Curated annotation (Swiss-Prot):
Residues noted as binding FAD in the record, renumbered to the chain: G11, G12, G13, H14, A15, G16
One GO-annotated biological process of the protein: tRNA wobble uridine modification
Protein's UniProt keywords contain NAD: yes
Recorded GO MF terms: flavin adenine dinucleotide binding
Cofactor: FAD
Keywords, comma-separated and alphabetical: Cytoplasm, FAD, Flavoprotein, NAD, tRNA processing
Gene for this chain: mnmG
Organism: Afipia carboxidovorans (strain ATCC 49405 / DSM 1227 / KCTC 32145 / OM5)
Binding positions for NAD(+) per the UniProt entry: 270-284
TM segment ranges: none
Pfam families on file: GIDA (PF01134), GIDA_C_1st (PF21680), SAM_GIDA_C (PF13932)
Entry's family note: Belongs to the MnmG family.
Protein name as annotated: tRNA uridine 5-carboxymethylaminomethyl modification enzyme MnmG
GO cellular component, one term: cytosol
C-alpha cells in the first residue's frame, strides 16, 4: 500500500463516495478511508433517494458524472416523479432503493475506479505542515501523506445513540464513532456544534397485514435518474400507506417524558422537516393522525421501513405504538428506532469551494457541514472532491453559484448563513427555479463538467448526441409555422390577428402539446418523446426564462463585486451591528453579504459604494 496520495477522503458514505470518485476522475491519486469496506454505500436511514429538491440534486450529480443517479437506477425498486401534476420546475424524481443492490453497485464502482485506492481504518488526527494539510494519522498509528483531505464523517463524529433512557457512543447502529477527529478539529480552533437526527424501527414485512393498508404503485414506465440509463430493468414493487390513530397518540403522550428529546437527555436540534413521531404529536396536537409510508428495503429482504414514525422512545413503547396502527397490530419489530447526536462544524468556516478557511487543503462535506440527507451529502462530496483534486494539482477551486444549480444554492446557504438545525434542500430555497429544473440539469452542468475534466467519455458522447437532437428539434419547431386561419382549421383556438405562429410559439399555449403540433406537421412525430418534452418545456417557459435571465445577470454582477481584503472598521457609515455581522461571516462577495441574516439594504449600499471607490482609486494608482 502506498503511503502518499494527492487526496485522502475520510468516510465511505454518500459524500465520501462522490468525493473520492470525483477526485479520481480528475486523475488525482486518491484514497478512500473507511472503517470497513463492506459498509461503503450503506443507506443508514431511509431506503430512498430523491424527492422534492433532492431529486434535482441527484440529477445535478449525474450531470457532473457522479455516481448516485446511476447507482439508484441499478438498485431502484419503485420510481415516482413527485408533483407530476405541477410545473416541471417543482417536480421531484424519487426512487425506493434496494439497500443491498445499491451498496453492491457502489462498492463495485469504487473498486473499478482508476486512481482510487481503499484503506480500512479510523482517522484519528489531521497532520499539518506550515498550517496546511500534509497528511492523516490513523488510530492504529499508520500515517499517510497527502496534499488535500476531504472529511465526510456523517454522524460518526463523537456520535451518541439514544434509545429511551439509554445512550451509548456509536456512529451508526452497531458501529463505533470517530472520536479523535473531533479533538483534532478543536485543537486547530474550529468551533464544533451538536446536531441530532433519528430513524424509525424496522419491521418484518411478512407480519404486516397488507390487506389493511393502502397500496402505492410506482410510475409506469419508470423514469431513471441518470441520462446514461436507457431503461429500468430491476423488478418493481409497491409501497403501503397507513396512518397513526388517536390510540397511537395516547400511547405517545403517556410516555413522552421517557423520550430523550423531552427528558433533557438530548440538547441538540433535529431536522425541522423530518421530526420524530413524538415531536409531531407535541407540536401538532390538533391532528388526529399522521401518514406512514411502508417502504420495502429490498427484493430479497423482508424488512420494511415505516417512513413517518422516527422515534427514540423506549423499545417497549415503540412496540406498543405499533399495535395501535392499522395493518401493523401484529407486526414484529426487527430493530427499534433511535436518535443520534453528532458533532458538526459551522459551515461558515468554509469557502464556497468547501475548503476550510482555517486550513488550506482541508475540505468538508455532508453532515459535518450541518446538512441532512443522502442527496445533500453526495452533492457536497462531489464538489469537495473535485476541488480537493484541483487544489492538490495546484489549481484554483471551482465555485458553483446559486444560478448554476441546487448544489450551488445549498453551498451558498451553508457558507453564508450557517445552520441552526440540520439543513435540507427544498425547491423553495432556489430563486431561479424555472431555470434550475431537474429535467435540464445536464444542459446546465455537463458542459462545465467537460471543461473541468470531471466528465468521462461515455457521458460526453451521450450529451453531445442529446444536444444535437435537441437543437435540431427546436430548430424544426421554430421553422414550421401557420396562419390563424390554418390553425383554426386544425382545431386550435387562435386569435384572428393575421400573425403567423411557429410550432415552438404554439407550444407556449397551456392547452397545446407536442402531440398537437405533430398532428399538423407529421415530421415532428419523428422526434423522440424525451426530446419532445424538453422542447415543449422550453417553449412554455420561454418568456419567463428570458425574464429570469435578466435576474441572473443582476445576481452575477453582485457576485462579481468581491469583498476580499476589506477591513469593515474602515468602511464609513456602517452601523456597529452590520460591522459585527460582516466581520463574523466574512462574505466573499456583495451577493453573499446580501444573504446574511438581517443585513440591511442601507448597509449593502454603503459597501457597494465603498468597493467602487476603492476600485477607482486602484485604477487611478495604476494609471499614475
Amino acid at each position: 500500500m502506498r503511503k502518499t496520495f494527492d487526496v485522502i477522503v475520510v468516510g465511505g458514505g454518500h459524500a465520501g463516495c462522490e468525493a473520492a470518485a470525483a477526485s479520481a476522475r480528475l486523475g488525482a491519486e486518491t484514497a478512500l478511508l473507511t472503517h470497513r469496506f463492506a459498509t461503503v454505500g450503506a443507506m443508514s436511514c431511509n431506503p430512498a433517494i430523491g424527492g422534492l429538491g433532492k431529486g434535482h440534486l441527484v440529477r445535478e450529480i449525474d450531470a457532473l458524472d457522479g455516481l448516485m443517479g446511476r447507482m439508484a437506477d441499478t438498485g431502484g425498486i419503485q420510481f415516482r416523479v413527485l408533483n407530476r401534476r405541477k410545473g416541471p420546475a417543482v417536480r421531484g424524481p424519487r426512487a425506493q432503493i434496494d439497500r443491498a443492490l445499491y451498496a453492491a453497485a457502489m462498492q463495485a464502482e469504487i473498486r473499478a475506479t482508476p486512481h482510487l485506492s481503499v484503506i480500512e481504518g479510523e482517522a484519528d488526527a489531521l497532520v499539518l505542515k506550515d498550517d496546511r494539510i500534509a497528511g492523516l494519522k490513523l488510530a492504529d498509528g499508520r500515517e499517510f501523506s497527502c496534499r488535500a483531505v476531504v472529511i465526510t464523517t456523517g454522524t460518526f463524529l463523537r456520535g451518541i445513540i439514544h434509545l429511551g433512557e439509554t445512550s451509548w457512543p456509536a456512529g451508526r447502529i452497531n458501529e463505533a464513532p470517530a472520536m479523535g477527529l473531533s479533538k483534532s478539529f478543536e485543537q486547530i480552533g474550529f468551533t464544533l456544534g451538536r446536531l441530532k437526527t433519528g430513524t424509525p424501527a424496522r419491521l418484518d414485512g411478512t407480519t404486516i397485514d397488507w390487506a389493511a393498508v393502502e397500496r402505492q404503485p410506482g410510475d409506469d414506465p419508470a423514469e431513471p435518474f441518470s441520462t446514461l440509463t436507457e431503461e429500468i430493468t430491476t423488478p418493481q414493487v409497491e409501497c403501503g400507506i397507513t396512518r397513526t390513530t388517536t390510540a397511537t397518540h395516547a400511547v405517545i403522550r403517556e410516555n413522552v417524558h421517557r423520550s430523550p428529546l423531552y427528558s433533557g437527555q438530548i440538547q441538540s436540534i433535529g431536522p425541522r422537516y423530518c421530526p420524530s413521531i413524538e415531536d409531531k404529536i407535541v407540536r401538532f396536537g390538533d391532528r388526529d393522525s399522521h401518514q406512514i409510508f411502508l417502504e420495502p428495503e429490498g427484493l430479497k429482504d423482508t424488512t420494511v421501513y415505516p417512513n413517518g414514525i422516527s422515534t427514540s422512545l423506549p423499545e417497549e413503547v415503540q412496540k406498543a405504538i405499533l399495535t395501535t396502527i392499522p395493518g401493523l397490530e401484529r407486526t414484529r419489530m426487527i430493530r427499534p428506532g433511535y436518535a443520534i447526536e453528532y458533532d458538526h462544524v459551522d459551515p461558515r468556516e468554509l469557502e464556497p469551494t468547501l475548503e476550510t478557511r482555517r486550513v488550506p487543503g482541508l475540505f468538508l462535506a455532508g453532515q459535518i457541514n450541518g446538512t441532512t440527507g443522502y442527496e445533500e451529502a453526495a452533492a457536497q462530496g462531489l464538489v469537495a472532491g473535485l476541488n480537493a483534486a484541483r487544489t492538490a494539482g495546484g489549481k484554483e477551486g471551482v465555485i458553483f453559484d446559486r444560478a448554476d444549480g441546487y448544489l450551488g444554492v445549498m453551498i451558498d446557504d451553508l457558507t453564508s448563513r450557517g445552520v441552526t438545525e440540520p439543513y435540507r434542500m427544498f425547491t423553495s430555497r432556489a430563486e431561479y427555479r424555472l431555470t434550475l429544473r431537474a429535467d435540464n440539469a445536464d444542459q446546465r452542468l455537463t458542459w462545465r463538467g467537460l471543461a473541468l475534466g470531471v466528465v468521462g467519455f461515455a457521458r460526453q458522447a451521450q450529451f453531445d448526441a442529446k444536444m444535437r437532437a435537441l437543437d435540431a428539434a427546436k430548430e424544426a419547431a421554430k421553422s414550421l409555422s401557420l396562419t390563424p386561419t390554418e390553425g383554426i382549421r386544425h382545431g386550435l383556438a387562435l386569435n384572428r390577428d393575421g400573425q403567423r405562429r411557429s410550432a415552438f410559439e404554439l407550444l407556449a399555449y397551456p392547452e397545446i402539446g407536442w402531440a398537437d403540433v405533430a398532428r399538423i406537421w407529421p415530421q415532428l412525430a419523428e422526434v423522440t418523446p424525451d426530446i419532445a418534452e424538453h422542447v415543449e418545456i422550453d417553449a412554455k417557459y420561454d418568456v419567463y426564462l428570458a425574464r429570469q435571465a435578466a435576474d441572473v445577470s443582476a445576481f452575477r454582477r453582485d457576485e462579481a463585486l468581491v469583498l476580499s481584503g476589506v477591513d469593515y472598521a474602515d468602511v464609513p457609515g456602517l452601523s456597529n451591528e452590520a460591522r459585527q455581522k460582516l466581520q463574523k461571516a466574512q462574505p466573499r462577495t456583495i451577493g453573499q453579504a446580501a444573504r446574511i441574516e438581517a443585513m440591511t439594504p442601507a448597509a449593502l449600499g454603503i459597501l457597494t459604494a465603498y468597493l467602487r471607490r476603492r476600485s477607482r482609486h486602484r485604477s487611478d494608482a495604476k494609471a499614475g
